[in-house]
């Protein structure tokens, strides 16, 4: 649909068609989903070559991720990476990295540090600026920027040997 608010009305049976059309046009197709495991999200995950799960240090977020990882393990899916975003809720630091790994029963592939917290992120978002291309952000947050670059390369790497449905 042209109006994103109507996206929830799209039947899951159209997702494979959308993926096939997008794969013919683009080298990389990004699909942003939400935590609820409905027909559309499950179908999108089935047809994805690689999946990036972004989690925070939030208990509800971690509980949802634990369930999703359990489903992936039960279905023998290995085509995912996990990014821990510590820069979003910088006040929520009551769980250590060890605690988070224990809760989700999985390793964390990439981490964004608390230092990557951008106070005026709305300003950049509204102007449409890509943070990884901003010189001052690159200068002050080089470690996190390099982490994101490595993650992006890992997401599009063909050597994973992980196939999505055709």
Please name every model-derived segment:
Residues 28, 50, 106-110:
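Well-ordered beta-strand positions
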């Amino acid at each position: 649909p042209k109006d994103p608010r109507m996206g929830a009305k799209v039947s899951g049976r159209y997702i494979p068609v959308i993926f096939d059309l997008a794969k013919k046009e683009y080298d990389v197709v990004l699909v942003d989903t939400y935590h609820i495991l409905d027909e559309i999200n499950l179908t999108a995950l089935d047809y994805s070559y690689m999946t990036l799960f972004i989690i925070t240090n939030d208990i509800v977020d971690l509980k949802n991720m634990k369930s999703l990882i359990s489903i992936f393990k039960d279905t023998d899916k290995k085509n995912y990476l996990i990014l821990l975003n510590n820069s979003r809720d910088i006040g929520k630091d009551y769980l250590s990295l060890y605690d988070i790994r224990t809760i989700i029963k999985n390793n964390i592939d990439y981490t964004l540090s608390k230092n990557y917290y951008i106070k005026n992120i709305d300003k950049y978002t509204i102007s449409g600026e890509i943070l990884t291309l901003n010189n001052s952000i690159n200068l002050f947050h080089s470690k996190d920027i390099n982490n994101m670059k490595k993650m992006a390369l890992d997401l599009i790497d063909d050597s994973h040997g992980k196939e999505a449905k055709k």
